[in-house]
Amino acid sequence: MSQDTDVVSVPILGKEAVFVGFNLERRVCDFLIENAKSSAYVIVTDTNIAPHYLEKYTTALSEAAKRHGVAPRILTRVIPPGETSKCRSMKAEIEDWMLSQSCTRDTVLVAMGGGVIGDMAGYVAATFMRGIRFIQLPTTLLAMVDSSIGGKTAIDTPNGKNLVGAFWQPLAVFADLNFLETLEPRQFINGMGEVIKTAAMWNEKDFCLLEQNPTVILEAVHRPRVPGQFKFENIRNLLQKIILASVRTKCEVVTLDEREGGLRNLLNFGHSIGHAYEAILFPQILHGECVSIGMVKELELSRYLGILKPNAVGRVTKCLMSYTLPVSVHDAHIKKYAGYKKCPVDKLIRIMAVDKKNQGLQKRVVILKAVGETYEKHATVVSDEDIRVVLSHDIQVSPFDNSVSDVVVTPPGSKSISNRALILAAMAKGTTKLTNMLHSDDTQVMMAALEELGAATFSWEDNGETLVVNGGGKFKTPSKELYLSNAGTAARFLTTVAALVGENEQGGEVVLTGNHRMKVRPIGPLVDALRANGCSISYLEREGSLPLKMIPQNGLRGGVIELAATVSSQYVSSILMCAPYAQEPVTLKLVGGKPISQLYVDMTIAMMKGFGVNVVKSETEAYTYHIPKANYTSPGDYEIESDASSATYPLAFAAITGTKCTVPNIGSASLQGDARFARDVLAPMGCTVEQTPTSTTVQGPPMGQLKPLESVDMETMTDAFLTATALAAVACNSSGNEHITRITGIANQRVKECNRIAAMVHELAKFGVKAGELEDGIFIHGQSYKDLKTPEEGIYTYDDHRVAMAFSILTLVTPKPTVILDKACVVKTWPYWWDVLRNSFKIKLAGVESKETVKSVKLTRSRASVILIGMRGAGKTTIGSIIAGQLNMKFLDLDQELEKKLNTTIPDLVNTRGWDDFRQEELQVLQEFIDTKSSDFVAACGGGIVETPAARELLCKYVKEGGIVLHIHRNLDQVLSYLSIDKSRPAYADRESTKNVYLRRHQWYLDCRSHDFVSPTIESGNVQSKLETSMSRFLRVVTGKSTWFEKAIQKPHSFFLSLTFPNINDAISFLPEAIIGCDAVELRADLLEDPNSTTGYPSVEFVAEQFATLRAAIDLPIIFTVRSKDQGGRFPNANESEAVELMLAALRWGVDVLDLELGWSTESLQAIYARKENTKIITSWHDTAQRCSWAQPDEWLQKLDMATAFGDVVKFVGIAKSMQDNFDLEKFRKSFKGYTNKPLIAINMGTVGQLSRVFNNVLTPVTSPALPYKAAPGQLSVRQIITALSLMGSISPKKFYLFGTPIQHSKSPILHKTCYDLTGLPYTYDLFETESVEGVKDVLSQPDFGGANVTIPYKLDILQYLDELSDEARFLGAVNTVVPISENGKRKLRGDNTDWRGIVRTFVRAGANNLNGKNALVIGAGGTSRAAIFAMHKLGAKNIYLLNRTLVNAEKVKAVFPEEYNVKVIDHTKQSEISEWTKLQVAAVVSTVPADRPLPESVSKVIDALLSEIPAQKKEQYVFLDMAYKPLNTPLMSVASKHGYTCINGLEVLLQQGLASFEIWTGLAVPFEHVFGLYMVLCAKEHN
């Protein structure tokens, strides 16, 4: 290696060909003229670099040529920046241009730019005229240390990056570090990812240099440029040194292995996994950032395989974090730039399969065995199973299989001691060397914060075994807010540390913040104590929690400090450790009762003594401590004891499996209270415990022999209660009948990472273990491990390391493997716990990704209890009952529950005790409901529940933890009208008007709710039915049970109707005809005209009522669209925040689909995507500016990345100027599948573009001739599109039939021909009457056979010709619909049954949407009775009574159905029981007996009795259906009508089941209302 003042050369492949230095332009140009003589030099660069450097280099090259007396041509080519330029077309464009410039084989190409320019221009050089000379002039740090060195050149293809290229060595590489001055900070840091990678993989000495200098390097990187000054001047030598180290390594490796025979792929450390992430996250996330994440994952893989020590993972991770590189896809940096993108493990592994390092199907990854040293001299073969464990969000733990009997496990260093030691060492004078430090998220957060505060610097010795802390007790105002994630210990300790920051000339503030969970954890008592001591601290969000803002003053004043310490001992330790640096000695008084966790306070005092400060406990005052004013002195070396709380898990492993385990460095002399766990908990449970001062050994009893603990106080080891709870679940070896363990003294565990007591109770239930909360503890009913259930939905861990590890112990004895969700939560205290399970305990693990990770406390949304809030009179009780019925939950009115509890009425309570007392009682009832009934209930709150701040906080917390708080909104005028006639409620306090109360509470309702349900204004018709229909759609979306989307995208053609009315009420009358054939309806919110708006766009309230009106009018999904002006709509682009507000509101309304324009800001897109839950998103882009071309779709493809990331469906809309535009679009549609599997809506606007609408097959926007105007130019109707497809041959003519005899009078042909005419289908429907079922055989085999209905007598006989049956047809044992289907290219005939569907639809249309909790009656026991019973069960009937003249036949029908159908046969011969039957109140009745056959008198009497008693106020919901229709009004209908039933004859069922068959055959829906009138007129003519 040679060097001069400004440049250092590094040899590669036997030549001095890589030069690293400053101001190299003259050297570069002289090199070209002297060593690369040519008639033409071609400089290729991009538009980012050209303005800064191109003229400078062309001038320098011209001057060099003059100096040498030559006159070559100097040509320049400037191309667009970015990865999209690294493609075949750009390469061809440059080559064609070079040919046009008469470039020959002596041409020399100069690649001046980043990796894209170097790779692409290098590949041009490799292939132009079979290879020309070139040099690399890298302008980014990443290119300098990576892509420019080694001769790799390539371009990207649609299938992946760098898949086409060549090895072509440059003549030279010039890394001119002056280029870095104009490099954006993020791009510089991106390059640091590669620098760190090289050092971590190859040279620990280089890595140490990087570890020691992040602050000074980042300060220079972020320093603003000043003309005439080099921004890196103060780190000039350091910068060159770290870049040289990386360059030197790469040159050395390339020299040894130019063509990647094995050694060179070591340079791909971090890339196997990093490239997989990059394939998904690029371009939002940069290469070096992805490699950073990949490094961490590959380090974790090395550790998981038992090759790399845990501290090495922590060390490299901290180094990456110190340079602000992301270390996880969950980092804030990733969320900021690409938070909307998902990285499914299956996809990552699939991408990893395409890696040049692989050996066939075997994946190879660079595995490290130490920092600076690889496991092998080439990438190591690793199984997909092991990779999946590291990459997966969740982990599956298999039961113990007796593979080990005696194990020694050393837990990581104590989190409590590690964090205290970091604080004390940072404040101490001198250098402290810490060993056995815990490497975890918590300690990394603490170290990063202390560095940012200027308190200490950190470095590593002994290959990462020793942390060297250079402290001194001086603090400065940090340059940014201190993000503490979910590190509660760090938050509490650093709050007081931050108070020591003194005033400075620059001013500033200290902000402590954290993640969502951290922002609800308490810190109020500590803040109160510090405020009282003169500290300026304010809450930035929630009172009593982070984030905090602290204004530096004169530090801690000192003197007497009073602190409430009954919640957390960490408050005490925080003040104790900082007290010596107060302005005067401190007397710390703990007030409010007995302090919690005294042993942790004692630990802190003992550690302070080790650093030279003695705390004196008062002998005269309880819980009082005297701390002198002093400075800490470093003890030099300080060994951190292993974490005693963590030690409980391996010891519990021994206890539950009957094996032996030793923890060698925790014993009876430990400072930690949890060290008593073995002696005080495991021994009484039946374990043999041996404990020395420094070690603990546990031998468990035989499996199943653990003893329950009647009562154990765990106040001195509260964190260990979770481990004890897991063991107690299978502790049943006792003499008594009850195997109950009671654990007390752990109240503080309710305010840890989560409410741990509630969490354990909830998750134990998944194992079938009964448990419950005590005032300060938990009780657990132990049972045999053989009786445990395997939790089907997995164990939710609440982002709590101890919950995860405790349940990992219990899963060892479950029947089958158990999934533990969010495995990464253990990084807080034992990052490699899963590795220990695998390597030490030989437990089989598997990485899994749950389809939908359960949300907090508990519950998937589908079973979460629903809490209703809203004004009195909004309809909470009515809607609550509907929700309970539809979700099969129980309904509670919390006002009524309060009255029961206090044995009084609310008006009396208010009159006697006042509103304040009432509100407190109301709050208590709500708290009890959430604590005890968080699933399977619906609760209506009183309208004023939001008046109480604590209640609002409770509701908000419930939402954050996964519960549903539904705000019921009703038009204010309607509420006022209703309340004016309702006198049963107490007057508001101070006789306040209802309107004022509404206005005051309205924002509180909005603050507390997770969703909104706007009650529709229904002027006429069946109000209850429409309300139930609206609620049904809402609930299907909110609970994730909606399946329409999946069905719609699988159909050959699907459509949605575009509504463009200024007021939806004007559209209602058009809808029955307009929605024919449609799968959804689009509500264009931007076109609504709010009469009260002065802004030019409608208010949220107005749109809400319009949305509710539409949802009540149709039973179709709604697509909600706010189209901006730039995209062809009316909503002002300048009012983006208001547009986002509307879209977020639509999500809360449970809208089925949201159209999300890609033109909104990334922040808006992310905000909406983050809250989408079960709503589907169409990401749309309308090329109204006509900048995109289907023929050259680069612009479309640039949109595609973001469209697929945010959307479930992509919608691209162009403008057709010629018919060719439509054909180009189809070519794009075909190629689209190579980019993504997301559905595509792609159309052209305008009349010329109509053909594109015909070709589009997924959710094509349509109009209808029934509407007064179209929504967009060129829009077609469903009928027009289907007609066009038919004319083109895309839809072939088909023939449909009715099989049966006699069928001459059937009206089925009329029905189906009407439907064909309405939709444009080229189909026919005919009667096929045959005396034998054999007659249909030839028809079934015809190629144009489209389907058939089957009636008597062939519903059973037809089965012999069918290949398969639907589940319903198989269950009912009869077929009335034959459907030809294609499966793997083979035609099959499928039998279905729509009889039951016809019955269900008839009841729904009549208003009986849901029979939950109600009784039903079926009369008759023939074939149709089965369909009727099936339909009643589908509608949710509680009991289904069956009445038939012949009891034995009724019993036969009953025997067909499972027990859960609750079919009960009525014995009509027992006339003495008639009085009992009148009490049944059957809400739904289906008669299946012929109308012309008189019933026995005993049967008639029973029917009359059964129908006689129905609630007068609910008569419209009681429906009688007679399957007979000759005559139209049957005798039984007359009886039912007399008693108040809504009566329907069988003609409607025939129509409904026929429409159901039509939908099955065609995929198109025709609304019943549109064909009903015509059908009934024709049928009436026939009967009359």
Curated annotation (Swiss-Prot):
Cofactor: Zn(2+)
EC number(s) given by UniProt: 4.2.3.4, 2.5.1.19, 2.7.1.71, 4.2.1.10
Keyword Ligase in annotation: no
One Pfam assignment: SKI
MF (Gene Ontology): 3-dehydroquinate dehydratase activity; 3-dehydroquinate synthase activity; 3-phosphoshikimate 1-carboxyvinyltransferase activity; ATP binding; metal ion binding; shikimate 3-dehydrogenase (NADP+) activity; shikimate kinase activity
Region (3-dehydroquinase): 1059-1280
NCBIfam families: aroA, aroB, aroD, Shik-DH-AROM
Name this protein carries in UniProt: Pentafunctional AROM polypeptide
Provenance organism: Schizosaccharomyces japonicus (strain yFS275 / FY16936) (Fission yeast)
Organism placement in taxonomy: Eukaryota, Fungi, Dikarya, Ascomycota, Taphrinomycotina
